[in-house]
Design a protein with these regions (language model features):
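The feature captures the beta-strand-to-loop junction immediately N-terminal to the Walker
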Residues: 36-38
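Helix-to-loop junction immediately C-terminal to a conserved catalytic motif
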Residues: 51
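Conserved catalytic motifs of ABC-family nucleotide-binding domains
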Residues: 76-85, 89, 96
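Conserved ABC ATPase "signature" region
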Residues: 100-118
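Conserved ABC ATPase signature
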Residues: 122-126, 130
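Catalytic Walker B motif of ABC-type/P-loop ATPase nucleotide-binding domains
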Residues: 147-150
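Conserved H-loop
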Residues: 175-181
């Protein structure tokens, strides 16, 4: 079975400073990969390269996944419209044949996750934890082949962390999940594979 992503000799520099150096890894198509490491290790940069959001300075990448992908940022990026609108808007950019049923699909996913009370609320006025939940649902609703998470539980209380952990585990049954997290307990708990990055270099994989 071919790998989902192949990274060979990846280098990423900013103003001649190495953010990533000689990164080689081969990501399989199933389960959850957690990328761990200290602040400044290059984790988010590596995640964005894996997602095709930025290009490396040198090295080669082979992507064996199809668009769309889902990407959940550390700080939720939502439109200043209702939660329902944000989810429907995501479907407009999906290549999946589900647009005609978009409202029904949005209602279903909100009800399924006990978040129907958020449907008509402005996304910018709900709590930070609720915004992150909506961001995750927005990423999942397009049924991507890969879901990328950049510090999804940062600065959230334990209740929201637990809910997000459950969402990630649920999503991983249908799609590959790659997550960057400083929360080592959570990242290790849910991961099928771990990759440890330090000073821009992979130190271990297991």
């Amino acid at each position: 079975m071919s790998n989902l992503i192949n990274l060979n000799n990846i280098v990423y520099q900013v103003d001649k400073k190495y953010i990533l150096k000689d990164v080689n890894c081969h990501i399989n198509k199933n389960g959850i990969l957690s990328i761990l490491g200290p602040n400044g290790a290059g984790k988010t940069t590596l995640l964005k390269i894996m997602a095709g959001l930025i290009k490396p300075t040198s090295g080669s990448i082979k992507f064996n996944y199809k668009l769309p992908i889902g990407f959940v940022f550390q700080k939720p990026v939502l439109l200043n419209r209702s939660v329902e609108y944000n989810l429907i808007h995501a479907l407009k950019y999906s290549i999946r044949p589900q647009i005609d049923q978009s409202k029904e699909l949005v209602n279903h996913i909100l009800n399924e996750n006990k978040l129907s009370y958020l449907k008509d609320k402005p996304a910018k006025k709900i709590s930070g934890g609720e915004q992150q939940l909506v961001s995750i649902l927005r990423a999942c609703i397009i049924k991507p082949e890969v879901l990328f998470f950049d510090e999804p539980t940062s600065n959230l209380d334990s209740e929201f962390k637990n809910t997000i952990e459950e969402l990630i585990l649920s999503a991983s049954k249908k799609t590959k999940v790659i997550i960057v997290s400083q929360d080592q307990m959570m990242a290790r708990k849910i991961a099928d594979e771990l990759l440890f990055l330090d000073r821009g270099t992979i130190r271990s994989e297991y």
